[in-house]
């Protein structure tokens, strides 16, 4: 089920995201003055903001993944904004490939987690309900590690790729080819 989760953490993140997004939009008026394709830039930037907002209010991990991918797509579009520059094209491709690799790990982690718990719902994946999931997650193993360990490691891999953490940080310096 799709929905909107408004708890104290998501509300705090909504305030942070909308404040930073507003500042970026305002700053962009001067930064992008005289540039060609300003409407396209604001469309990409707005898609990025919308995706971040959707990510933090998602009620389940699958809905979060949809917005997670939209963040990646809008990042790709923003990095490749100057599509006539070969360096911008190369940078956007590099970011796309590295983050898709990480996102694949994120997706596999989600699928492992949902397979063993039987749900995508955050409410059922919380500590209050962990006793329901722990026996099934601890039961399966691969290469000596439990299903829970694999799921969490793969989820972390996805987060590491999207946030440019080592060793999946290689795309970030090239991302400066887009409007910064």
Predicted features and spans:
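...captures the hydrophobic TM-helix bundle architecture rather than a specific catalytic motif
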Residues: 1-180
């Amino acid at each position: 089920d799709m929905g909107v989760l408004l708890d104290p953490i998501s509300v705090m993140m909504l305030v942070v995201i909308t404040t930073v997004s507003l500042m970026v939009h305002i700053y962009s008026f001067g930064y992008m003055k005289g540039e060609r394709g300003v409407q396209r830039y604001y469309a990409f930037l707005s898609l990025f903001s919308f995706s971040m907002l959707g990510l933090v209010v998602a009620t389940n991990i699958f809905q979060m993944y949809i917005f997670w991918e939209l963040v990646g797509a809008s990042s790709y579009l923003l990095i490749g904004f100057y599509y006539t520059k070969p360096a911008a094209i190369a940078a956007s491709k590099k970011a796309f490939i590295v983050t898709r690799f990480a996102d694949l790990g994120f997706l596999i982690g989600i699928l492992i987690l949902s397979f063993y718990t039987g749900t995508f719902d955050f409410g059922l994946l919380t500590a209050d309900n962990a006793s329901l999931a722990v026996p099934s997650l601890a039961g399966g193993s691969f290469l000596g590690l439990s299903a829970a360990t694999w799921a969490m490691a793969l989820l972390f891999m996805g987060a590491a790729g999207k946030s440019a953490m080592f060793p999946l940080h290689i795309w970030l310096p090239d991302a400066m080819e887009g409007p910064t």
